[in-house]
């Protein structure tokens, strides 16, 4: 036949048709991604006989997307900007006005939230005052992530539903952010804790006879009172009981001090020209698959003997994510100075992991009391 029919998806889809000439004109745009936005024009195709039913036909499709994702072009473009200019570009791409921040530190604190957008299986905890934009950023910036707010969370919903034979949230998402985590009810604490520990360690999960793997990061987002904004106090006491175990907390790579971010105000809302948000979220998604940056980190980071493996891996993952965000043009160890690598990648990664280590000492002093992260340092490129 001269038509391309939708088959195997139920009777409704059998009554839809794409004429051959329309398919030839639109197929490239329709198939370039798993999801596409565009303007669709539909028409009615009359039946060939009284015994047949009419069909809805596609007349035309106009792609909304005004760009093509070219990762190499994006990397090359970074060389045309200073670091401060690039930081402002990133903030504009996520709908924030860089001029509304009081300091570079505040800007970098906001950009730190994007680490799990660019690095696979990066697990983070952020506690912050209300109104700092946690829900918006993790729920609206990228279509590749998932924000779950309050309610009930089960192993079936997170990993795999045996009854329905469907994959859970970690499958097919870049991250799963549990917003207002203090209000989430976990149906079976021991079951959920065991599943999380296994997945956060190696990216694999087993539910019944089903074995799965995914690349989604796990993000905990919670509100914290001003009196508890101290990394040397127990900041995790209000978290659900499932997270009151040191072995699980140890699998979170870093902690974000959300209180370093300003409360959302009108001055922080984007105005004027900015990088397209959908384009930027797609770029971040593509960066997850680029192994170049981890190779640079491995070459530039000196690891002391007998360093704790989880600490080292956590710091390197966070460091890699910072490198992708702030210096995407870096493709070789010598492409970034030791000063910039240490100040903007390694040092903040160590600080984020150190807070997890301090909290572990408070939560489980017998196992982690007095322990610190290894003293990783920057190697010169000629070493």
Walk through the language-model features, giving the residues of each:
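C-terminal alpha-helical "lid" subdomain
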Residues: 298-383
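Single conserved hydrophobic/aromatic residue that forms the stacking wall/gate
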Residues: 2-13
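Conserved ASCE/P-loop NTPase catalytic core
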Residues: 98-233, 250, 373-376
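Phosphate-/polyanion-interacting regions in eukaryotic proteins
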Residues: 17-68
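Phosphate/oxyanion-binding active-site loops and adjacent basic polyanion-contact surfaces
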Residues: 86, 188-192, 276
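Charged, amphipathic alpha-helical linker segments immediately N-terminal to NTP-binding catalytic cores
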Residues: 54-101
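Amphipathic, well-packed alpha-helical segments that form the structural scaffold of globular domains
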Residues: 91-95, 118, 253
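Phosphate-sensing "switch" segment of ASCE/P-loop ATPases
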Residues: 211-218, 223-326, 330
């Amino acid at each position: 036949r001269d038509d391309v029919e939708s088959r195997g998806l139920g009777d409704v889809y059998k009554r839809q048709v794409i004429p051959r000439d329309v398919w030839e004109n639109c197929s490239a745009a329709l198939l370039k991604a798993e999801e596409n936005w565009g303007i669709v024009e539909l028409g009615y195709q009359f039946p060939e006989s009284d015994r047949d039913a009419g069909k809805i036909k596609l007349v035309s499709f106009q792609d909304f997307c005004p760009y093509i994702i070219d990762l190499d072009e994006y990397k090359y473009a970074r060389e045309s900007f200073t670091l401060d200019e690039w930081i402002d570009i990133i903030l504009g791409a996520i709908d924030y006005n860089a001029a509304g921040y009081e300091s570079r530190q505040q800007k970098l604190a906001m950009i730190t939230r994007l680490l799990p957008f660019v690095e696979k299986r990066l697990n983070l905890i952020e506690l912050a005052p209300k109104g700092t934009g946690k829900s918006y950023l993790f729920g609206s910036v990228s279509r590749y992530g998932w924000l779950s707010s309050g309610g009930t969370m089960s192993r079936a919903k997170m990993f795999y539903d045996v009854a329905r034979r469907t994959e859970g949230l970690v499958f097919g998402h870049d991250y799963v952010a549990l917003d207002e985590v203090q209000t989430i009810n976990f149906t079976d604490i021991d079951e959920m804790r065991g599943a999380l520990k296994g997945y956060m360690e190696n990216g694999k999960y087993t539910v019944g006879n089903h074995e799965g793997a995914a690349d989604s990061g796990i993000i905990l987002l919670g509100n914290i009172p001003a009196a508890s904004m101290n990394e040397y106090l127990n900041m995790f006491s209000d978290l659900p009981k499932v997270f009151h175990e040191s072995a699980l907390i140890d699998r979170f790579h870093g902690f974000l001090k959300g209180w370093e971010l300003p409360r959302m105000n009108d001055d922080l809302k984007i105005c004027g020209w900015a990088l397209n948000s959908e384009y930027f979220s797609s770029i971040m998604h593509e960066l997850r698959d680029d192994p170049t940056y981890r190779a640079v980190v491995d070459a530039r980071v000196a690891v002391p003997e007998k360093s704790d493996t989880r600490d080292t891996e956590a710091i390197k993952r966070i460091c890699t994510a910072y490198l992708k965000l702030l210096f995407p043009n870096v493709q070789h160890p010598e492409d970034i100075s030791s000063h910039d690598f240490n100040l903007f990648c390694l040092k903040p990664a160590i600080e984020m992991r150190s807070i997890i280590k301090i909290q572990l000492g408070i939560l489980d002093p017998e196992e982690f009391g007095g322990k610190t992260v290894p003293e990783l340092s920057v190697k010169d490129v000629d070493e």
